[in-house]
């Protein structure tokens, strides 16, 4: 009840404390922002890591390439130094050859380069040097190579038949190569190869291929006849147009070969010819028979048995059993290879006369080669 004159309170007192606030509709926005930021940071970090890894890999690759380059340069310079020291080594061994009643020949130090220079190589090369010299590199200073290594293989190009000698333009160079080529191709076991068609569908016998190789390099326009026993150079008129009649014609070069691979352009030189007379074992360059480098004279001390047999048969009279009987040729190749392995790379002959004497069954190795 209200007293007279009193009025009702328009705002009655609240009960139970404060009135609860209305729930906000944007309550999870902060969580979404945090997750979005973390996602963006993760993507940026992943891209940064990929970019950094790529740059690191590139830097490591450039570092290794630089090490490899200078290791290779070092091996070349060390090899030159070793070859330049050959006269000193030969002089030191002269008394030994005098006891054998022959002058000191050129010592093929390059055949031992990988082992002799192993003292400047990695751990594997150090072990090779230790097995050769019996001396550990720990006893010296500035030896060994960390983080890199090299492998040296030096090949004597004068141990092969030089097919570039006719480019000199003289009859003697032509005749010498003709004799070497005919001696190389003369074995009767190769008859099936020369009696069938070549890759161009043509028949090319021994004389045709021999003449084609010489005509490719000599500067004249006359066809050369390969007959090493004629005693003089023979011409058979103008060079033919064989190369102009091919499906893809090209001119005869009449100049020196730029590389041994260019020999594939010459008439009759197919895969069978290449594998038999040019490069029988590509993984072993010392087995290669022909070359476009060198002086032209074959070094029989470093030549492989097949090349030595070609030199012998090129100078032998027709009908020599060694050149006409495959069994005799095989026997000689085996004996020559055995003698070379027995000497462990040391030169067999001090002079050309010693080589001829050995072929006649005389001298230290004559009995083994003529057996």
Can you annotate each of these PLM segments?
Residues 4, 17, 23, 29-371:
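Compositionally biased linear targeting/interaction segments
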């Amino acid at each position: 009840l209200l007293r007279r004159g009193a009025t009702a309170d328009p705002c009655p007192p609240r009960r139970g404390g404060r009135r609860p606030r209305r729930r906000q509709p944007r309550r999870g926005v902060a969580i979404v922002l945090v997750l979005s930021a973390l996602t963006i940071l993760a993507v940026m970090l992943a891209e940064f890591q990929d970019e950094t890894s790529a740059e690191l890999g590139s830097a490591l690759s450039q570092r290794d390439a630089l090490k490899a380059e200078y290791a290779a340069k070092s091996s070349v310079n060390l090899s030159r130094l070793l070859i330049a020291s050959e006269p000193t080594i030969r002089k030191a061994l002269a008394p030994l050859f005098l006891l054998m009643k022959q002058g000191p020949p050129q010592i093929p130090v390059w055949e031992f380069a990988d082992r002799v220079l192993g003292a400047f190589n990695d751990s594997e090369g150090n072990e090779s040097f230790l097995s050769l010299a019996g001396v550990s590199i720990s006893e010296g200073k500035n030896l060994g190579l960390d983080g890199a290594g090299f492998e040296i293989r030096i090949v004597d190009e004068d141990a092969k038949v030089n097919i570039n000698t006719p480019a000199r333009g003289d009859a003697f160079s032509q005749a010498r190569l003709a004799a070497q080529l005919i001696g190389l191709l003369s074995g009767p076991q190769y008859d099936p190869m020369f009696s069938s068609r070549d890759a161009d569908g043509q028949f090319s016998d021994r004389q045709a291929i021999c003449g084609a190789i010489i005509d490719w390099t000599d500067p004249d326009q006359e066809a050369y006849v390969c007959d090493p026993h004629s005693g003089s150079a023979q011409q058979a008129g103008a060079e033919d147009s064989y190369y102009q009649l091919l499906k893809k014609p090209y001119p005869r070069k009449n100049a020196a070969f730029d590389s041994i691979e260019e020999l594939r352009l010459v008439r009759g030189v197919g895969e069978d010819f290449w594998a038999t007379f040019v490069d029988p074992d590509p993984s072993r360059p010392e087995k290669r028979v022909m070359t476009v480098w060198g002086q032209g004279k074959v070094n029989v001390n470093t030549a492989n048995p097949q090349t030595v047999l070609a030199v012998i048969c090129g100078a032998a009279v027709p009908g020599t059993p060694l050149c006409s009987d495959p069994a005799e040729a095989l026997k000689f190749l085996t004996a020559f290879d055995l003698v070379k392995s027995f000497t462990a790379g040391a030169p067999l002959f001090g002079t050309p006369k010693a080589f001829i004497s050995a072929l006649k069954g005389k001298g230290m190795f004559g009995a083994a080669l003529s057996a």
